[in-house]
């Protein structure tokens, strides 16, 4: 069984640096999906960004995080944020969490230890 370990925390607190170091040390690591989507949208002139269409952006992030989750094959894999991070941002912005998203979070559990970078 794969141990999927999430590294979470506020923006700019070192999550990506930790992920890069773990990758250098040979661990399978998954990048921050939100950043990739935003960069792609800015490059292509798209509007699926958190400041233009948070609902659509969140759906895309959750879908891509689910793909990351389901692709795990190694004994231990690290994630720069997880599915639950997306739901937390929705709650913060008072956006209702759909039953689909709740189901995805409930049916795709990460390892019970989560690392949170300090602010």
Predicted regions and their residues:
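Residue-level preference for the first positions of well-ordered beta-strands
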Residues: 4, 75-78
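Hydrophobic anchor at the beta1->P-loop junction of P-loop NTPases
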Residues: 7
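The conserved Walker
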Residues: 11
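Conserved glycine(s) of the Walker
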Residues: 14
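Conserved Walker
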Residues: 17
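Conserved substrate/cofactor phosphate-moiety recognition/catalytic segment
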Residues: 20-64
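Short amphipathic alpha-helices and their capping/turn segments at secondary-structure boundaries
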Residues: 57-74, 99-110
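ATP-dependent NMP and nucleoside kinases share a basic, alpha-helical "lid"
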Residues: 79-119
